[in-house]
């Protein structure tokens, strides 16, 4: 391993913005399928201590973990000093990359637009969707029967705000879970265990939400 990147003065320096951009560009150049991939982890592969002790002029190797347009998880190593893709492997279905913000917000949008979800809210007397907060959680453990093996999934729970500025976590919409298949980009089931009254108390602690302050 030779040749230090021009963006770094020491082999253990964190990646610069330009190095991260270079790594992504190299990945997309060598594999066109990554044109629309999302990345959950990009970091420097630190060199072996022995090698570092013997030579401070080392190549910079970047590890990227992400999800491609087919929702397959992958790991790749890129030599940004030589602008080469060293390795790329698909991640086993038994594991998966961290959820990306795009997936999380995508799950929220899919849930909010789902007709059965909206009907479940109406059954609870909830009609103003702007006051509903949806929180997607990992879909592992007991995987919904309608989600194919290997597909990426989230399960979403909901909370109801009494105003736009309210702390929604004080008012859970209980007994309602949306199972979202991220790979198929659809809600596969709305799990409804019956109506439970939403707590009425507010949880706002700003001056407008409290009559008196301690």
Where are these regions (language model features)?
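Short, ordered beta-strand-loop transition motifs
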Residues: 53-59, 82, 145-152
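Extended, regular secondary-structure scaffolds
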Residues: 92-94, 99-214
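Amphipathic N-proximal alpha-helical interface segments
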Residues: 63-92, 159, 175-181
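N-terminal trafficking/processing presequences and adjacent post-cleavage segments
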Residues: 5-26, 89-113
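Short, Lys/Arg-enriched N-terminal segments with co-localized hydrophobic residues
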Residues: 1-3
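N-terminal-proximal low-complexity accessory segments that begin disordered
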Residues: 5-70
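Short loop/beta submotifs within extracellular cysteine-rich repeat domains
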Residues: 34-35, 71-74, 83-87, 118-119, ...
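Short, structured motif recognition centered on aromatic/hydrophobic residues
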Residues: 23-27, 59-66, 74-76, 107-115, ...
